[in-house]
Amino acid sequence: SALPGENHVIRLAIDFKNALSWLSLGPTRAMAEELGVPLELLPYQTEVSVLTEARKEETVAERHARVRAEYYADDLKRYAKLQNLELVADSHGVDSTMALLGLLWGNQKGVGLDYAHSVFSRFWSDSMCLDDVQSIGEILTLLGAPGFEPGAMHEELNTVRATLEAEGVFSVPMYLVEGQVFQGREHLPMIRWLLAGERESVPI
């Protein structure tokens, strides 16, 4: 477990339309629970990379971009399968603002983690839209956080984004731990090491 008496916290910036954010949630939550460290999910809206199709005549740059995108997509599917997660939704052109506002509401009511898991699961299994206010409200109500009022929370969403960017966040998933910033769940071993007080060998 983490060192007693220390005010450790894991802050994780996520976007519901970002598959890497979904893949990071389970392992991060499990580690936080094991170490007894609070996990705070923070909304950060991002752009979605578009997977381009092969054309008969491609420039070298176009081909390299396509190959990278194809590898990225295959990599996501590989790790999703290991976690038994569905990744069937198309995130291209999706506006996640409403779902991120729901996360702010869920955080205020103490159900942010369960809300995020539910939204990720439903969206990526293609059973809900991220801009569906009714679905978001229903999830929050089921979790004991009724009365979702998105209109009053846009300013807070912008404030959270500005604060995160001032701390070095530029994408998702990104971790803010012990005054340091890490991009991607591949840094979880290092984050664990920091939270354990650097008592073990450096995980590199």
Predicted ranges, named:
Residues 1-37, 118-204:
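C-terminal cap of thioredoxin/glutaredoxin-like
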Residues 23-123:
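Structural alpha/beta surface segment adjacent to cysteine/selenocysteine redox centers
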